[in-house]
Amino acid sequence: MTERRLTRIHSIKERLGDSLSHHPNELLALFSRFIKQGKGMLERHQLLTEYESVIPEADREKLKDGVFEDTLRASQEAIVIPPWVALAIRPRPGVWEYVRVNVNELAVEECSEYLKFKEDLVDRSSQSNFVLEMDFEPFNANVPRPSLSKSIGNGVQFLNRHLSSKLFHDKESLYPLLNFLREHNYKGTTLMLNDRLQSLSALQTALRKADRYLLSISKDTPYSEFNHSFQVLGLEKGWGDTASRVSENIHLLLDLLEAPDPSTLEKFLGTIPMVFNVVILSPHGYFAQANVLGYPDTGGQVVYILDQVRALETEMLLKIKQQGLDITPRILIVTRLLPDAVGTTCGQRLERVLGTEHTHILRVPFRTDKGILRKWISRFEVWPYLETYAEDVAHELAGEMQATPDLIIGNYSDGNLVASLLAHRLGITQCTIAHALEKTKYPNSDIYLKKFDDQYHFSCQFTADLIAMNQSDFIITSTFQEIAGSKDTVGQYESHTAFTLPGLYRVVHGIDVFDPKFNIVSPGADMSIYYPYFEQEKRLTALHAEIEELLYSSVENEEHKFVLKDRNKPIIFSMARLDRVKNMTGLVELYGKNDRLKELVNLVVVAGDHGKESKDLEEQAELKKMYKLIEEYKLQGHIRWISAQMNRVRNGELYRYIADTKGAFVQPAFYEAFGLTVVESMTCGLPTFATCHGGPAEIIVHGVSGFHIDPYHGDKASEQLVSFFEKCKEDPAHWEKISQGGLQRIYEKYTWKLYSERLMTLAGVYGFWKYVSNLDRRETRRYLEMFYALKYRNLAKSVPLAIDN
């Protein structure tokens, strides 16, 4: 029998060195090509293009036997500073290695100071000066974390497995659970257990007595009828509204005390009423329920939050009722009050959210020592106002809620920073939702900070993001890609693992995507508004005349420009803000370039506002570009350009009307964190093509529930559209197949009911673990206080204050 041996796994440096030894001519030619381009940065796609260009196919076949091609494909970027080429290699999501090659000597070495080397691209002085380095890794050394990429985004399951084995290794270690249940209360009223129960044995005895008592009464008996008997045993309200539900929960706890396991623990914690008052932060933009969508900085995030709170309130009311409590929950969406409200309700302090009973929008103004800021300002200019804003919000919450919130949820960079300040001040559980991290949307905006900072103030924003993501108790994302990208692309959070802001600081370890604080909780679309086109009894036919006017009238005005000459064609439809990243002009260009596509279908885009001059510089530039493209490709007769539509109900029917034409929805963004419009269109049964960069790549199963397109390759995307519509022309069942595939995908994964159930469970589980373990990360918080006071504050002061006209 052959003896089995353990062999050492060679490092990437060693394997790359072997490749250079075995194929010196081919690799010298390639690296020399990199060097010839001079000092600079090469992106992954450029590296692969050069590889295929320089090395003949026959030689590439030889290289496939080794590791070089795999290493090159795993390289996300190369820094070229002759004679060195440094590679940032990502073998799998969340795992990075850095090497550099001396092309003159064909020698490879590890590049432990990769960021310092990278800074040479823009700032040679960093080599001699002391540079602040931020490193959060030592503070998280004792936080358990998985090692497999597939575990990323399943933080709560991993945490429960790890900590329950630690916490429940013997009877004595269960005391933190007993103490947690005894101390749990609402506004001073004890819930779950009272002080009669001082030991675990007393708790088990009381639970068994309660169980025997419940067997003697009807399952439907209301809790109020045996409330007094349970109080004598040491059990308070919160176990359930009926004998049946109380019995289920008592059995869960008995099972947990007898044989602890993670799933029982999570299930039990999910039944404990812990969240009654929720605060949701979203300061920037025009936050209102009507007439705001399409305004600058006002889009999917507003829709997300309004749908979120309706589902959340429904879930909270249901849980409170099921637990037998008479408590009124409260949800407050905190946003900015805009005295210059331009025809919206953004100047109103308090506004109830339609479709809810206990949820309101609370608006608090931005102010300085000179008074209240009246006008809208860009999300990139809010930084100098946020500290004072957080203080004002704390004061308003105390008066409005009359209780300390149980959970605070931040949205986007500004909301997450304010949530961090409030959570730190009030000592409450904090949840972070990024929606979009700008560092990913604007490639190389870190290393080339000086190019961006005057306009976008990314030095403030990236610092705020770093503070919020490290302080938060848990982070929810809509997709895996938001956290850790894919095999070939870097995730939004992952891009904050290590980066540099030349002249400010280096982040050598910013966030770990394996951290158990990350959880994927995908939202859905409001199914009272977005539902399939074939549900004829629900269709809003009264709106069809308006929609036909919008799409087909021969009149051009401030709401719609350009006239479609053939209304019998299917429609390619798209709806988004008019900014560079959303890439609506890219869609118009790929359509304009493809004559066959123009023959097959019309194009309808909803973006921007013809009726007013935008204050947003990016929107102004995209507006001009759109007109130029329409003229260049002679799209009059083929395109309808509609101003941003504020009416969500009509938008839902608009999706369905497009489906009636057997059209398709296209989402062409260069990057999309999630893709709410993708979910909306699929929920309406409209076949959907969406960017492969970001969340839509997970929402859509390519070829089954829709199609992925690459906005960086418009010609290929247009051919995909041609192929689809030609196939549908030959076989109408193909359109139905993709439509049904999209609906099936939505029902399985993307509904608000699933979302709200999961969010409530997460809030309870993280609140519990924060109580019984060291998950409050006190050391990290002290480090963040210093970072905020010494770095963020000065950066925020450097942002010019807005001036009211």
UniProtKB/Swiss-Prot annotation:
Gene Ontology molecular function: sucrose synthase activity
Region called GT-B glycosyltransferase, residue ranges: 274-751
Keyword Lipid metabolism: no
Pfam families linked: Glycos_transf_1 (PF00534), GT-B_Sucrose_synth (PF00862), SUS_EPBD (PF24862), SUS_N (PF24861)
The keyword GTP-binding appears for this protein: no
EC number: 2.4.1.13
Catalytic activity: an NDP-alpha-D-glucose + D-fructose = a ribonucleoside 5'-diphosphate + sucrose + H(+)
An annotated GO BP: sucrose metabolic process
Superkingdom, natural source: Eukaryota
Keyword line: Glycosyltransferase, Transferase
Transmembrane segments: none
NCBIfam families with a match to the protein in the record: sucr_synth (TIGR02470)
Record function comment: Sucrose-cleaving enzyme that provides UDP-glucose and fructose for various metabolic pathways.
PANTHER family, sorted: PTHR45839, SUCROSE SYNTHASE 1
Family: Belongs to the glycosyltransferase 1 family. Plant sucrose synthase subfamily.
Protein name: Sucrose synthase 1
Organism: Tulipa gesneriana
